[in-house]
Amino acid sequence: MVIIRSFFITGTDTDVGKTVVTSLLTRFLIDMGVNAFPYKPVQSGATTNGARMIPSDAQMYQLVRPEFDVTDFNTYLLEKPCSPHLAADLANITLDRTVITKQVHQLEEAHDAVLIEGAGGLYVPLTNDGYCYIDFMEELNVPTILVSALRVGTINHTVLSIEAMKARNLPIAGIIFNQLQIGNPVIEQSNVETIRKLTDTPILGFVPYSPDIHTVLADDKLRRHLYKDWDKRRFKELIHSD
């Protein structure tokens, strides 16, 4: 029996591939028989098309859930490409955490799994009163998937992120590594093994580099190739019960 459950997708930094991983994870779970829905509560850096604001990250979501409108994946759309608290201030908008939480629960009622994507890393402010994404994660108390980029510096960034979550007693589902460019496989493997030893955290999978990720996400065969080696057993433990 599938549990109705949310997962929080966070990253070690901005531009590490959270949206790519969230999109892939959506289809990965759907392939496992789980009705998964990607959701980014606050989208900053939205573009405008006439009077309509277009969320760039949600456009990627729509490639894997094309039956939904691009505006269905966010609660707040903000134009400035900066931290949500500042983008909201610049737009004279107040971000209401209770509205976001209510939206999460409504989505949970409609889907088996809701994949909640944060912005930047753990300590990016969500509101200007000092409430950060890690505070929101603590409030939701759902399993967290950490996206880490396979690049120089990833050991420090990943270990610090894991330690910050452990300090808050947040449930950690595991780490997904995203290859942003073709790198040295010896260095990449060493980084992964070092992180595994230092954090004792499950490695859920890897996303190999793709020069045209939008084309890949829109194609079933190409998309499945990116997550073919993900840890299905671990995910089954997280989303199923007797």
Swiss-Prot record:
<feature type="binding site">
    <location>
        <position position="19"/>
    </location>
    <ligand>
        <name>Mg(2+)</name>
    </ligand>
</feature>
<dbReference type="GO" id="GO:0005829">
    <property type="term" value="C:cytosol"/>
</dbReference>
<protein>
    <recommendedName>
        <fullName>ATP-dependent dethiobiotin synthetase BioD</fullName>
        <ecNumber>6.3.3.3</ecNumber>
    </recommendedName>
</protein>
<comment type="function">
    <text>Catalyzes a mechanistically unusual reaction, the ATP-dependent insertion of CO2 between the N7 and N8 nitrogen atoms of 7,8-diaminopelargonic acid (DAPA, also called 7,8-diammoniononanoate) to form a ureido ring.</text>
</comment>
<feature type="binding site">
    <location>
        <begin position="178"/>
        <end position="179"/>
    </location>
    <ligand>
        <name>ATP</name>
    </ligand>
</feature>
<dbReference type="InterPro" id="IPR027417">
    <property type="entry name" value="P-loop_NTPase"/>
</dbReference>
<feature type="binding site">
    <location>
        <begin position="117"/>
        <end position="120"/>
    </location>
    <ligand>
        <name>ATP</name>
    </ligand>
</feature>
<keyword id="KW-0479">Metal-binding</keyword>
<dbReference type="GO" id="GO:0004141">
    <property type="term" value="F:dethiobiotin synthase activity"/>
</dbReference>
<dbReference type="InterPro" id="IPR004472">
    <property type="entry name" value="DTB_synth_BioD"/>
</dbReference>
<keyword id="KW-0547">Nucleotide-binding</keyword>
<comment type="subunit">
    <text>Homodimer.</text>
</comment>
<feature type="binding site">
    <location>
        <begin position="15"/>
        <end position="20"/>
    </location>
    <ligand>
        <name>ATP</name>
    </ligand>
</feature>
<keyword id="KW-0963">Cytoplasm</keyword>
<dbReference type="GO" id="GO:0009102">
    <property type="term" value="P:biotin biosynthetic process"/>
</dbReference>
<keyword id="KW-0436">Ligase</keyword>
<feature type="active site">
    <location>
        <position position="40"/>
    </location>
</feature>
<dbReference type="GO" id="GO:0000287">
    <property type="term" value="F:magnesium ion binding"/>
</dbReference>
<keyword id="KW-0093">Biotin biosynthesis</keyword>
<feature type="binding site">
    <location>
        <position position="44"/>
    </location>
    <ligand>
        <name>substrate</name>
    </ligand>
</feature>
<feature type="binding site">
    <location>
        <position position="117"/>
    </location>
    <ligand>
        <name>Mg(2+)</name>
    </ligand>
</feature>
<dbReference type="GO" id="GO:0005524">
    <property type="term" value="F:ATP binding"/>
</dbReference>
<comment type="pathway">
    <text>Cofactor biosynthesis; biotin biosynthesis; biotin from 7,8-diaminononanoate: step 1/2.</text>
</comment>
<feature type="binding site">
    <location>
        <begin position="208"/>
        <end position="210"/>
    </location>
    <ligand>
        <name>ATP</name>
    </ligand>
</feature>
<dbReference type="Pfam" id="PF13500">
    <property type="entry name" value="AAA_26"/>
</dbReference>
<keyword id="KW-0460">Magnesium</keyword>
<comment type="similarity">
    <text>Belongs to the dethiobiotin synthetase family.</text>
</comment>
<keyword id="KW-0067">ATP-binding</keyword>
